[in-house]
């Protein structure tokens, strides 16, 4: 808070607290010297007393500040109300999300006019191969719809309410959820039956996060220290007192925070620990929840990495699966790289850099770029970069940074950044397995939304847009075949086809580019045959699409509604 005691009046004399208070009516925090010693240095903190939120002095001071704020803002009351009403008039309050399949249910969110919070809902899938989201109308319940969590009802009686995480068991019977009713970001987690609505007696109070094991027999959760740092992971057997819980990991280094979750394939419990520049991943098989967590790769100073797991189904010499570890790291490149490890031929302890390099970022213009390529640090960041390990679409990219990869049962999605814009590239899982086993660069194709091909007109309906796309898919097929490296996605425009020098035609230096954001999202199921992605720009509302990497069919699932227009 600004302290006016150091200000001088027109005469040059130092003004007192009282004179400043009298002139503007602003409350001024009193000074209560408290000595604190850090590393041998003494520091006098005159406002340490403000840390005690339960103190009557602190509460009185905050109340006085709030009154002062209302007093000073009173002349703007009408304008504030006008701005609020104008912004609210553009928001469609009665709305819902596109259903997302997880295990045996389609999950979605409803929002209702006049309600402060969303309502979490679900409906059962129709069959194991049901991958088309059900058609659900705004405000109209669908057969079999179940309310999973009505935040409006849960928030009643609380001045503040926030959900701090929600994990539903694989069989859909149990929900582990956390709530914060004070605003201090410490959450109380409970276990609720989704069949009866009743809750188990155990409550995990004041924690940072939690997850089930796949069988919902165990809960792992993160404890917070006095500085709100997540520092320890606890193990709890469902149905037993929390006093019997066991600490399974304790982070001694105060620079590091800790998190717990399940790997994408749900075969491992994952502890992620990291500081601002260093990360480490520890794993424990979900088949042995009482076992010991072990580091996948021991932490190295100033090295960030993450690991996920997948497999190439039936791609082995005798039709067996090939288990994979997919490592994303910056140990050898400041703009990150992705390595895929065949876990049949590599054994722990693993090291960063082993396996097949699938995508490598540019070292140009980076602080440690010289360690990758001599002279790279002094080169402009937009210098075209090529690497023999990279897919053809990345060769010659400007300012290339690798942002991640996800390997599902039917497709592989690569996310990267070039020319300061985010990009997505996709390929089928079968094609990725062939390239991996052959030791050649993977043949990704960039996904370019149709919005980049047209005049950004958004007056058409979803059905009209999809009908127009259907008319051009056949032509794009022929174009893809004519381009040589042509397992192109139907949703990809002519601009995205790889040119002879490896650059994309819409990314040439000196051209005017539309600014947009695109990203993979809403794909929690490993088995889903289609990939969802989002797209938005400064002049176009957010859109959610899905695309079939095998056929290239691109569907617009939802576009955000902006009431009253936005031109």
Question: Language-model features: where?
Answer:
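N-terminal pre-domain segments of enzymes
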Residues: 4-6, 12-73, 81-95
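Short loop/turn segments that connect beta-strands within beta-propeller blades
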Residues: 126, 193-197, 237-241, 285-289, ...
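A conserved hydrophobic secondary-structure block that centers on an alpha-helix together
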Residues: 146-210, 414
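Loop/turn-rich, solvent-exposed surfaces of beta-rich toroidal or solenoidal domains
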Residues: 312, 319-339, 397, 403-418
């Amino acid at each position: 808070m600004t302290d006016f005691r150091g200000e001088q009046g027109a005469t040059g004399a130092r003004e007192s607290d009282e004179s400043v208070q009298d002139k503007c009516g602003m409350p001024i925090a009193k000074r209560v010297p408290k000595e604190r010693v850090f590393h041998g240095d003494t520091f006098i903190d005159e406002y340490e007393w403000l840390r005690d939120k339960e103190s009557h002095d602190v509460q009185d001071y905050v109340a006085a500040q709030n009154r002062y704020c209302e007093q000073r803002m009173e002349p703007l009351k009408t304008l504030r109300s006008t701005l609020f009403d104008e912004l609210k008039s553009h928001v469609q309050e009665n709305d819902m999300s596109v259903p997302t399949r997880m295990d045996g249910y389609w999950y979605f969110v409803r929002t209702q006019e006049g309600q402060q919070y969303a309502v979490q809902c679900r409906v059962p899938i129709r069959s194991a191969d049901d991958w088309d989201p059900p058609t659900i109308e705004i405000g109209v319940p669908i057969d079999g719809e179940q309310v999973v969590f009505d935040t409006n009802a849960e928030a009643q009686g609380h001045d503040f309410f926030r959900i701090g995480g929600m994990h539903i068991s694989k069989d859909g019977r149990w929900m582990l959820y956390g709530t914060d009713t004070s605003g201090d970001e410490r959450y109380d987690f409970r276990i609720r039956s989704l069949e009866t609505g009743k809750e188990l007696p155990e409550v995990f109070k004041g924690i940072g996060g939690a997850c089930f094991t796949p069988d919902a027999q165990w809960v792992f959760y993160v404890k917070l220290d006095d500085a709100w740092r997540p520092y320890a992971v606890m193990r709890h057997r469902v149905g037993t007192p929390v006093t019997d819980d066991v600490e399974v990991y304790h982070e001694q280094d105060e620079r590091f925070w800790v998190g717990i979750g399940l790997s994408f394939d749900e075969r491992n419990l994952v502890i992620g620990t990291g500081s601002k520049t260093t990360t480490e991943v520890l794993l424990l098989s979900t088949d042995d929840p009482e076992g010991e967590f072990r580091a996948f790769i021991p932490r190295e100073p100033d090295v960030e990495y993450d690991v996920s797991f997948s497999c190439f189904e039936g791609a082995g010499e005798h039709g067996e699966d090939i288990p994979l570890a997919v490592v994303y790291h910056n140990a050898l490149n400041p703009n990150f790289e992705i390595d895929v490890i065949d876990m049949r031929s590599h054994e722990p302890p693993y090291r960063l850099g082993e396996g097949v390099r699938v995508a490598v970022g540019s070292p140009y213009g980076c602080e440690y770029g010289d360690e990758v390529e001599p002279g790279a640090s002094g080169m402009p960041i937009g210098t075209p970069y090529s690497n023999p390990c990279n897919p053809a679409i990345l060769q010659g990219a400007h300012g290339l940074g690798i942002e991640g990869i996800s390997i599902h049962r039917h497709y592989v999605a690569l996310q990267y950044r070039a020319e300061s814009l985010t990009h997505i590239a996709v390929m089928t899982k079968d094609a990725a397995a062939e390239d991996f086993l052959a030791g050649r660069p993977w043949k990704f194709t960039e996904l370019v939304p149709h919005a980049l091909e047209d005049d950004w007109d958004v007056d058409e309906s979803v059905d009209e847009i999809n009908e127009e796309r259907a008319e051009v898919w056949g032509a794009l097929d022929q174009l893809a075949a004519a381009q040589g490296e042509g397992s192109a996605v139907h949703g990809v425009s002519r601009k995205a086809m790889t040119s002879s020098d490896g650059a994309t035609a819409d990314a040439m230096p000196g051209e005017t580019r539309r600014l947009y954001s695109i990203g993979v999202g809403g794909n929690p199921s490993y088995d889903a045959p289609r990939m969802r992605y989002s797209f938005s720009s400064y002049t176009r509302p957010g859109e959610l699409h899905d695309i079939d990497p095998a056929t290239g069919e691109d569907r617009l699932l939802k576009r955000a509604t902006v009431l009253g227009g936005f031109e």
